[in-house]
Structures are given as structure tokens and as C-alpha cells.
Amino acid sequence: MIVGIIGVLLISVLASPAGAQGYSSREPAEPSDSYWKKFALGAGVSLLAHESAHILTSIALGFHPYIGFDKGRPTVYSGIDSQRYPHKQFLFSAAGLTTQALINEAILDIPHSRGGAIERGILAGGIGTTLFYITIGRNGDVSDIAFMARTSSLSKTQLSLIFGGVSAIHAVRIWRNPAYSHFFVGPTENGLGIGFQF
């Protein structure tokens, strides 16, 4: 609950500058370099919200989270004994993806000027993280999906369908909204540019 409130507050704060991020076809498009930097910033904000949700949930439940490494990858550990407190571990594991879904939902629902690069990055960060966790990241030693499956009656497949379904709905809503045209595809002088360019 606390994480959800923090997520809504975060969106309220981020919604204020969204007016300056809006894209109008009458205005010149942002330079490509600036656009991708802002997009990456938005994706970083989404990932920071994901990890912060884990930390805040653990603290709210009365535990002491810590950051460590799993096979060289930085990882937030709950500090919760999952054998003794499986429900609390489930809440910790679900907090990151749930917060990102709530942030994406708020962006898509709260009226504001839409389509800025930072906003697109936040949306892509939420969808991308979910896509990672429901595919190649679902079987990792410290995978959120794997921990949720171990600490609940839901299987990895069921959890993947739940979180993947929400992100799929977000993707469809983005695809249907003209403010998000060219979300990952943009016109170039030679046709279409797909994905990222380095």
C-alpha cells in the first residue's frame, strides 16, 4: 500500500513537467541525441522506481534490505526469511513490477500533455523490465517471478501471464494513442529507424 502511494506521488511530481515534454507536430522535433538521452533518463527513472519499491516494501514490513551481488549483478535483497515469512517475501518480490505497472497506468490515465521523451522512457522501462522478467529473467536465482512462485500458490507461468498481460494492455494503449506515434519506430530520410541507434 505504501509503495503504491509513493508511486502515485512520484507520478504526480513527474506529471508537472510533462507539459514541457509534450510533442506537437507544429514544433520541430528534438535532436536525436537529446531525445535518446531523455528517453534513457526516463527508463532509468522507471528502473530506480522498481528497485526503490523493493527497498521501501522491505522497510515497511520491518526488515532490513541490503544490496549485494548475484553472479556479478547488483541485486536488492529483502532481508526477509522467505521460509518463515513467505507472504512478506511475496510482497517484496512483487513490489518492483507492481510499482512500474502503477506508474505506467498513471501516465496513461492522468490527463496531461503526452508523448515526451522522458515519459516514453518511463513507459518503455516498465514494459521492458516486465518483458525481461517474464522471459529470460524468470528462472534466475534472484528473479522476482521465481521468488513469487516459490512463496505463493501461483506458478511462474501464471505470474508471467498476470504481469505480462498488464504490460501488453499498456503496449496496446500506447500503440493506439496518436501522442505516442513512432514509440520505437521513427521516420528517417531512408525509410524507418527501428529501435536504438548508437
Language-model features: where?
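Hydrophobic alpha-helical membrane-embedded or membrane-associated segments
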Residues: 8, 38-42, 46, 100, ...
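Short juxtamembrane and helix-loop transition motifs at transmembrane-helix boundaries
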Residues: 53, 80-88
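Membrane-interface loop-to-helix entry segments
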Residues: 87-103, 151-163
